[in-house]
Curated annotation (Swiss-Prot):
It comes from Hepatitis E virus genotype 2 (isolate Human/Mexico) (HEV-2). Residues 72-114 are annotated as: Homodimerization, and interaction with host AMBP/bikunin. Belongs to the hepevirus ORF3 protein family. This is Protein ORF3. It comes from the Viruses. Residues 28-68 are annotated as: Interaction with host HPX. A motif (PTAP/PSAP motif) lies at residues 96-99. Keywords: Host cell membrane, Host cytoplasm, Host cytoskeleton, Host endoplasmic reticulum, Host membrane, Host-virus interaction, Inhibition of host innate immune response by virus, Lipoprotein, Membrane, Phosphoprotein, Viral immunoevasion, Virion. GO terms for biological process: symbiont-mediated suppression of host innate immune response.
Amino acid sequence: MGSPPCALGLFCCCSSCFCLCCPRHRPVSRLAAVVGGAAAVPAVVSGVTGLILSPSQSPIFIQPTPLPQTLPLRPGLDLAFANQPGHLAPLGEIRPSAPPLPPVADLPQPGLRR
């Protein structure tokens, strides 16, 4: 199974890379913004999102990076986990990070009479 050639006669290989000069891959509804003399082309093709800078009108080829096998932590959580000594506490074990709060006095509820 071959892919149709792009506008410059090159063949698009969607499994490994794609060419933005091809009408099949070119973003239709978005205009290119000019940033410092380079055309910034937003690309959203088969799950790949990015801003591609091209100094000329030559075809742009994008090689998508493979996704890591492990799920990344949320920003900030990696620092929190990195500062912990050792592994997480076993189930049922409590490691308080702050001293316990003092007991709270029993205050009457608003609207109730004693």
